[in-house]
Amino acid sequence: MKTKRVVSIILAALLIISVGITGFAANDEAIDGSNWMSAIDGEKRITAINIPGTHDSATVNADTNTVSRTQSLSIAGQLYAGARYFDIRLKKSGKSFYSVHSVVYNRKDVGLFGEKLTADDIIADFRAFLTKNPGETVLMLLKEESSRTGTDFYTGFYEKYIEPESDLWYVRNDHIPTLDECRGKIVILRYNSVDDERFDNTNSGISFNGYPYINNYKTKDFRFTQVYMTKPEDETREEPSSYAGLYVQDSFRLAPEKKWMAVSSFLANVKKPWWFSVCVTSSAAGSSPYYNALLINKKLMEYPFEKGRLYGIISVDFADAELCGRIYQSNDFTNEPNAATAAPEETIVYACLGEFIEKVRNVLFSVIALFVK
């Protein structure tokens, strides 16, 4: 009798375990690029989440296509692939904000002299995605490029986009927000300075004003700066409680082989959950950005990401769903995810010589890819 009872208990325990494992696996399988954040504990702070992102995010139709182009997906395409950190560079001209890469304009259309891409277009993609997927958030690194308007840049952006639609934005700078605080919102990571008389920690955006410019050839030049805000009080540490950390690897001048040394070393380093850890994998040295990205992304796909280990934000060139998935799947998923949603159909609009330029580009990229395999 006792033996039967013991066997029954063991079988019941095994059944519970198997159901739990099956449930977790099924839960994992229900996660994709549209809904992965909804499966993460909302009390987790955004600095404690592994987030795929994109470098120079809006360059899919940059003017000098093979030199300035660092992405092959539109903003919407990147969102549905799983990217949640976006490097958005804007030129202020009057009250307009144009998407640029250095002095080069990004376009809505493929080809020469297409319609210029603006912040309105980018924000529209973010808004549409978050409306369909309210369990997600978007981290937007907001940077002025090409123009130099000082504090007028953020003031103009705030008045045009944030103030009229305040519920869409997270712009506090007084603590590290939890995921629940950011769900359904665009989180501003502000690169530029602000007018201190107009803005304070309630509306200035999370300050990335100390983001480093790493213009050298060192493979282990990782920069740490302070982000002045209040750290969460529920964690014990020796550092002062008035700031969080910004920990960055962005040695863009390294050739791909050395760049990978920098990336892999940074990923292997222990990160603190109150740091904004940002690893930018792009390389501007040697060949084209596409060739460099093929080499680095291949190694990133092979990297042994550990489930539950903190890597932080990983910002890549030429992101796709497979690569983004490798990064976000390293998170611990504790919640039942929201239903996945499909990416909207995108219509390609060709400007002057657009089809010809696209064909030449595709042939060129195919040839480049042969040298990587």
Positions of predicted regions on the chain:
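Positively charged n-region of N-terminal signal peptides that target proteins for export
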Residues: 1-9
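Hydrophobic core
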Residues: 11, 15-19
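Long, acidic (Asp/Glu-rich), low-complexity accessory segments flanking structured domains
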Residues: 20, 26-81, 94-132, 186, ...
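Conserved, mostly hydrophobic/aromatic
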Residues: 89, 140, 188, 314
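Metal-dependent phosphodiesterase/phospholipase catalytic core, i.e.
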Residues: 90-95, 100-173
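Surface-exposed intrinsically disordered loops and tails
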Residues: 108-113, 208, 238-241
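Glycine- and acidic-residue-rich phosphate-binding/metal-coordinating active-site segment common to enzymes
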Residues: 155-235
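C-terminal functional modules
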Residues: 213-340, 353-356, 360, 364, ...
